[in-house]
Amino acid sequence: MNLIIDKGNTVCKVAVADRGELIAHYSFPQVSLREAGSILADHPALDAAIYSSVASVDKTLLSLLTEQLSTVCMVDERVAVPVQVAYDRSRLGSDRIAAVVGAYSLAPEGVPLLVIDLGTAITFEYVSPSGEYMGGNISPGLYTRLKALNHFTSRLPLIQDLEQQEQAFGQTTIEAISIGVLRGVIHEIQGYIEEVKAK
């Protein structure tokens, strides 16, 4: 049974999986030792952990995992992956290569893959039909865009909760920001999809 920890820029996602089946999942701003200990106690069959962090590595958490589990794999530029990588691995975020490997392992052979991850940033990764990771692009995420509009303008408010709107154009500032940011991301994603389809 595997403990999977994905420490992102904003949220730390934790999952327990067994032979490809999701058993439990959690989300924390940061995983404390108490929370990690509780997860380990709740799932005594855990024997391995996979740890990925885009931020600084939590050495205390890694130490706990190493003490409690037989195998701990930290995703970094040295970890072996089942795809050819046409990218400087030392400069590639562990979250990005983990997303590529996850998508590649789930997809049928011989098809091009566009792997999209929406978080603080939106990442677009391209895997060729021959299974070579060709690289990718990074764009601001939804809430990064909202924060930027608020921070870099004098009068636009910070919107915390986006609401899906039916209309194409807003009739208030709040609607204009919500629709503009959501539709901007949607069109950006659709543009990448069309580009990959055309290859």
Feature names for model-found ranges:
Residues M1-I23, A103, G110-Y133, L149:
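Gly/Thr-rich phosphate-binding beta-strand-loop-beta motif of the actin/hexokinase/Hsp70
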Residues M1-V81:
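N-terminal glycine/serine-rich phosphate-binding loop of ATP-dependent small-molecule kinases
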Residues A36-I39, P82-A86, R145-N150:
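Short, charged, surface-exposed secondary-structure boundary motifs
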Residues D42-A45, L106-V111, A198-K199:
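Glycine-rich phosphate-binding loop signature in dinucleotide/nucleotide-binding domains
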Residues T71-P82, T120, P157-Q165:
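Acidic-glycine-rich active-site phosphate/pyrophosphate-binding loop
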Residues P82-L113:
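Conserved phosphate-binding catalytic cores of ATP/NTP-utilizing and phosphoryl-transfer enzymes
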Residues S139-A198:
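Active-site rim beta-loop-alpha module in soluble metabolic enzymes
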